[in-house]
Amino acid sequence: MSISFDLTIDDTRDQLARHARASLEAKPSLIGMSREEMAAALIAAGVPERQVKMRISQLWHWLYVRGVSDFADMRNISKDLRAMLAQHFTIARPEVVEEQISQDGTRKWLFRFPPRGAGRPVEIESVYIPEEGRGTLCISSQVGCTLTCSFCHTGTQKLVRNLTSEEILAQLLTARDRLGDFPDKDTPDGAMVPAEGRKITNIVMMGMGEPLYNFEEVKKALLIASDGDGPSLSKRRITLSTSGVVPEIYRTGDEIGVMLAISLHAVRDELRDILVPINKKYPLAELIKACREYPGLSNAKRITFEYVMLKDINDSLDDAKLLVKLLQGIPAKINLIPFNPWPGTNYQCSDWEQIEKFADYVNAAGYASPIRTPRGRDILAACGQLKSESERLRKSERLALEAMMIAGHGE
């Protein structure tokens, strides 16, 4: 659902009012519902209770295995039931506003989701990173972010709202559409994807937002993504990255059970307070304690610690020594991330020689410490560069949106 803004405010007031009312009365999506929620929704829509289990099984297969986005394509469901489902529910994909392809094959999509309640349409970014033998989709959990990490582009955008489980899963489903990763779908000509098997083999909750500040919706989405009768992604291939929301780290291990990544970036509280301000609430001692107690932690299920390399800020050998000491005894991998510049930042990337010295010290201490190859820099798709276009709407679009909401509330 989208709006054309190439109209004057006076001429479009009635259209905008109708759109606002339609937004408030939008049909619920079946995507992102748990089986229990779907059962309740189907019964409320008139599906006989004795049929519900079978219908959920059919819908689950069509939505998550076959990847259909129109009830009409569900061929083993009667025409009458398909019509009833279409009357009460939607399974539509978000609007793909823009798709950018980097020189290295990385793809970035700008997705637009319809309003929620009295809100306005929102936009988020997702990134696909092809590698030898696998393809990773970086998914967003919020529109904007509250954490204000000083080196992160997304952190400069205010939080608009949390994404729903539907919107989180829609990023995966739409990316699979675009890559031809569903049966009977074609891969775009020239697309860089794994030669065999799935195009999307891994997902990482490392896009816009702090996933653990949207715990319930993220949990619901990831449990569906790992469902053996649905997308069927192994929990070993799903990584949730957090800046350190300590109480929910424990819940993540107990209730979701996916791989954990920590946006660390500093080994001294006084510096991390600046780089990652949530450290003031959950300092390093509390964060590391939660990591040591993460359920299932082992050499086969290591925690990934992300460490952005900032010139003359956190890249000294003393920092490397403190890092090794801090993580002692934790099965871990340390991703060293060359800082990815973005417009307006005051930080610089560490010199490559210094990054290698840092990596050599950490590696010699027994920790895998790969230097992450920057991907998608030319399309602002690299780590720390994501930022939706929602804050960059043209003035005319903002005015039209405001008029739409005013008109809707004035009826």
Swiss-Prot record:
Domain spans labelled Radical SAM core: 131-380
Gene3D superfamilies per the UniProt record, alphabetical: 1.10.150.530, Aldolase class I
CDD domains, sorted: Radical_SAM (cd01335)
Enzyme class name: transferase
Pfam families: Radical_SAM, RlmN_N
Cofactor names: [4Fe-4S] cluster
GO CC terms of this entry: cytoplasm
EC number annotated for this UniProt entry: 2.1.1.192
Active-site feature positions: 125, 383
Catalytic activity field: adenosine(2503) in 23S rRNA + 2 reduced [2Fe-2S]-[ferredoxin] + 2 S-adenosyl-L-methionine = 2-methyladenosine(2503) in 23S rRNA + 5'-deoxyadenosine + L-methionine + 2 oxidized [2Fe-2S]-[ferredoxin] + S-adenosyl-L-homocysteine; adenosine(37) in tRNA + 2 reduced [2Fe-2S]-[ferredoxin] + 2 S-adenosyl-L-methionine = 2-methyladenosine(37) in tRNA + 5'-deoxyadenosine + L-methionine + 2 oxidized [2Fe-2S]-[ferredoxin] + S-adenosyl-L-homocysteine
SS bond partners: 138-383
Cofactor details (free text): Binds 1 [4Fe-4S] cluster. The cluster is coordinated with 3 cysteines and an exchangeable S-adenosyl-L-methionine.
Gene Ontology MF terms: 4 iron, 4 sulfur cluster binding; metal ion binding; rRNA (adenine(2503)-C2-)-methyltransferase activity; rRNA binding; tRNA (adenine(37)-C2)-methyltransferase activity; tRNA binding
Keyword Iron: yes
Binding site for S-adenosyl-L-methionine: 209-210, 241, 263-265, 340
GO BP annotations listed: rRNA base methylation; tRNA methylation
PROSITE patterns: RADICAL_SAM
Coarse class of the protein's main subcellular location: cytoplasm
Positions of [4Fe-4S] cluster binding: 145, 149, 152
Keywords from the UniProt entry: 4Fe-4S, Cytoplasm, Disulfide bond, Iron, Iron-sulfur, Metal-binding, Methyltransferase, rRNA processing, S-adenosyl-L-methionine, Transferase, tRNA processing
Domain of life: Bacteria
Function: Specifically methylates position 2 of adenine 2503 in 23S rRNA and position 2 of adenine 37 in tRNAs. m2A2503 modification seems to play a crucial role in the proofreading step occurring at the peptidyl transferase center and thus would serve to optimize ribosomal fidelity.
Stated family: Belongs to the radical SAM superfamily. RlmN family.
Cross-referenced HAMAP family: RNA_methyltr_RlmN
Descriptive protein name: Dual-specificity RNA methyltransferase RlmN
Organism annotation: Brucella suis biovar 1 (strain 1330)
Gene responsible for this protein: rlmN
